Swiss-Prot record:
Pfam families membership: Cpn10 (PF00166)
Protein name (record): Co-chaperonin GroES
SUPFAM superfamilies: GroES-like (SSF50129)
HAMAP family the UniProt entry points to: CH10
Keywords of the record: Chaperone, Cytoplasm
GO biological process, one term: chaperone cofactor-dependent protein refolding
GO cellular component, one term: cytoplasm
Length: 96
């Protein structure tokens, strides 16, 4: 099963954060917060402007992005935990 977002929404799969500190101390799952970066796996058609035009996305599928702690809505599709959010909720793209 796939999810196809509508309009100016994107679907993001969270990327796991490092769970070991510089001193090789392993941080348990219960002490970590959900990561605030992820990979875009699907995008909608674009934002519909007031004049009816559609503005294309700045981001693309495959981009690794940063987003806010409370951004979007968490959904579970085909056993994967995903986040559906508006493009405006994305703070930046991590360049490789």
């Amino acid at each position: 099963m796939k999810i196809r977002p509508l309009h100016d929404r994107v679907v993001v799969r969270r990327l796991e954060e490092e769970r070991t500190t510089a001193g090789w101390i392993v941080i348990p799952d219960s002490a970590t917060e959900k990561p605030m970066r992820g990979e875009i796996i699907a995008i909608g058609a674009g934002k519909i402007l007031d004049n009816g035009d559609v503005r294309a996305f700045v981001v693309k599928v495959g981009d690794v992005v940063l987003f806010g702690k409370y951004s979007g809505t968490e959904v579970k599709v085909a056993g994967q935990e995903l986040v559906v959010m508006r493009e405006d909720d994305i703070m930046g793209v991590i360049e490789k």
